[in-house]
């Protein structure tokens, strides 16, 4: 599994939410209050941290913290 703590840290930093709110089930828009700019910045931070490229099409499919974990795992193989 992708490093959940690292992903959580990025989300907390990018969205300014409390660590306790960042669970695999948390939805970025509905639960964590992210807007479209927040999600773009989050994707960019994830790309930089994990050395991966996330296409716009794939980024649109990432809606929860769990989606990020699965996606990073898949990319890192």
From Swiss-Prot:
The biological pathway it contributes to is: Lipid metabolism; fatty acid biosynthesis
Q: Does the keyword Signal apply?
A: no
Give the domain of life. Answer: Bacteria
* Pfam assignment, any one: PP-binding
Cellular compartments annotated: Cytoplasm
Kindly provide the PTM information from the record. 4'-phosphopantetheine is transferred from CoA to a specific serine of apo-ACP by AcpS. This modification is essential for activity because fatty acids are bound in thioester linkage to the sulfhydryl of the prosthetic group.
MF GO annotations:
acyl binding; acyl carrier activity
Task: Say yes or no: keyword Cytoplasm present.
Answer: yes
Boundaries of every Carrier domain copy = 1-76
Which one GO biological process term can you cite for this protein?
lipid A biosynthetic process
Q: GO terms for CC?
A: cytosol; membrane
Which keywords belong to this entry?
Cytoplasm, Fatty acid biosynthesis, Fatty acid metabolism, Lipid biosynthesis, Lipid metabolism, Phosphopantetheine, Phosphoprotein
Q: Which residues are modified to O-(pantetheine 4'-phosphoryl)serine?
A: 36
For this protein, the record's NCBIfam families field holds: acyl_carrier, PRK00982.1-2, PRK00982.1-3, PRK00982.1-4, PRK00982.1-5
Q: What family does the Swiss-Prot or TrEMBL record give for this protein?
A: Belongs to the acyl carrier protein (ACP) family.
Primary role: Carrier of the growing fatty acid chain in fatty acid biosynthesis.
Protein name in UniProt: Acyl carrier protein
Species whose genome carries this gene: Leptospira biflexa serovar Patoc (strain Patoc 1 / ATCC 23582 / Paris)
| Taxonomic path | Bacteria, Pseudomonadati, Spirochaetota, Spirochaetia, Leptospirales
């Amino acid at each position: 599994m992708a490093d959940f703590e690292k992903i959580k840290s990025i989300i907390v930093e990018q969205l300014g939410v409390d660590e306790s709110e960042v669970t695999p089930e948390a939805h970025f828009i509905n639960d964590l209050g992210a807007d479209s700019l927040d999600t773009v910045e989050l994707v960019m931070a994830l790309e930089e941290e994990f050395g991966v490229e996330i296409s716009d099409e794939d980024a649109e499919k990432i809606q929860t913290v769990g989606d990020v974990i699965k996606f990073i795992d898949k990319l890192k193989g």
